[in-house]
Amino acid sequence: MPKSWPIVISSHSFCFLPNSEQERKMKDLNFHAATLSEEESLRELKAFDETKAGVKGIVDTGITKIPRIFIDQPKNLDRISVCRGKSDIKIPVINLNGLSSNSEIRREIVEKIGEASEKYGFFQIVNHGIPQDVMDKMVDGVRKFHEQDDQIKRQYYSRDRFNKNFLYSSNYVLIPGIACNWRDTMECIMNSNQPDPQEFPDVCRDILMKYSNYVRNLGLILFELLSEALGLKPNHLEEMDCAEGLILLGHYYPACPQPELTFGTSKHSDSGFLTILMQDQIGGLQILLENQWIDVPFIPGALVINIADLLQLITNDKFKSVEHRVLANKVGPRISVAVAFGIKTQTQEGVSPRLYGPIKELISEENPPIYKEVTVKDFITIRFAKRFDDSSSLSPFRLNN
C-alpha cells in the first residue's frame, strides 16, 4: 500500500463480542463534540469497529447525541442549511414505455438520456421493466438483513472485499480525521459469472438473486441507449466490458438524533461506469450542480440513474459524473439499493490488464483526448488516494495534469 494512503482500520482481524462487551464498547465512545487528536480518533474508531454492530448498534443503545467520530467539519456542515432545496433545477424523469416497440419513441428516449447525461449526470426512469413487487421485496430484504439478530448479522461483518462475495460493514473505510457516515451497508458482488447463492444470507438470498438479474438486464439496455446517444453502435459500451463488474449495495441509514452534525453519505462521485439506485420515500439524496445542492426527489416506482467517473473518462467529458451526497435525517431508517456497474478487476489471469481511455470514435481534431489511458489497477489505486481531498477525482488522469 502506498505510504500516502490514509490509515485504514480493518475489522476482519477483530474478535466477535458478546452483548455485554458490545454495550461496554459502545459506552467507550465519546458522545460529545470536540476536536479529536489522531490517537483519540484511532481509539474511538477501533472501539466502534470492534462492536461489529454498526450505526444501528449505536442507535439501539438509545443515544441522544452522536459520537464525535461522526461529527463532520463545519465547512461541510454549513452547506446543509445554505443550499438545501433552494434551486429551480429539476432532475429529468424519462419514461421508457414503448422503448422496444416503437423506433420513434426509442429515438426520443435516446435523445433525452443523452441530454440528461451531458447536462446533469443524473436522471430518473419510469416504466423500466422491474416489477414494483420485486423492488418492494428488495427494500424489505435489505431491511430484514440489517434488523435481524446481531449475533447472526455480525458473522458477515468484514472489510475483506477481495475474498468475499457478501459482507456487511459500517463505512467503506474508517480513517482518523475523516468523519464517519451515519450508514451501514451490505455489499454483494454480482459479476457476470454469478457467485454461489449459498454465500448470501437466508434472509435476503432469493430477492438478491432475482433483483440483481433484473437490474443486470436493465443495465445492458441503458448501456445500449447511452451508446446510441454517443453516436456509436448499440453494443459498443457492452463490448468495452462496462457491464461486467456489478456490485449491489444495500444501505441502511438509521434515524439520527443530530442530523445537522453529520451525513448519511458524504460528498463523492461514483468510480465505475453507471449506477442504478432505488431509494425509499424518506429521500435525502442531493447532487451538486452549478454550485448548488439539488434534491433528487423520491418518485414511486422510479429508479435513479447516474453517470460515474469511468464513463465520463471514456466519453471524453461528453457525459458528466457529478458529486452527490445523502443527508442524515431524524426520520428513519432510510433504505436504498445501489447497483454499480464498474470494472471487473479480477480475471483468471489476475488483475485485468485492459486500458481505458477516451473512445477513439469520439476523438477528432476539434475534440482531442482530454484523458490519458489508464489500467484498471492504476485507476483504482490513484482514485482511492484522491478520495478524501477536494480536487476532482478525475484530475490525475487528465493529459494536462
Curated annotation (Swiss-Prot):
One of its GO terms (biological process) is alkaloid metabolic process. Keywords: Alkaloid metabolism, Cytoplasm, Dioxygenase, Iron, Metal-binding, Nucleus, Oxidoreductase, Vitamin C. Pfam families: 2OG-FeII_Oxy (PF03171), DIOX_N (PF14226). It catalyses: deacetoxyvindoline + 2-oxoglutarate + O2 = 4-O-deacetylvindoline + succinate + CO2. Pathway: Alkaloid biosynthesis; vindoline biosynthesis. Coiled coil: none annotated. GO terms for molecular function: desacetoxyvindoline 4-hydroxylase activity; L-ascorbic acid binding; metal ion binding. 2-oxoglutarate binds at R334. Its EC number is 1.14.11.20. It is found in: Cytoplasm; Nucleus. Its cofactor is Fe cation; L-ascorbate. Residues 242-345 form the Fe2OG dioxygenase domain. Highest levels in leaves, lower levels in stems and fruits. Not expressed in flowers and roots. PROSITE patterns: FE2OG_OXY. The keyword rRNA processing does not apply. GO terms for cellular component: cytoplasm; nucleus. It comes from the Eukaryota. It is an enzyme of class 1 (oxidoreductase). Binds 1 Fe(2+) ion per subunit. Catalyzes the C4-hydroxylation of desacetoxyvindoline. Belongs to the iron/ascorbate-dependent oxidoreductase family. This is Deacetoxyvindoline 4-hydroxylase. It comes from Catharanthus roseus (Madagascar periwinkle).
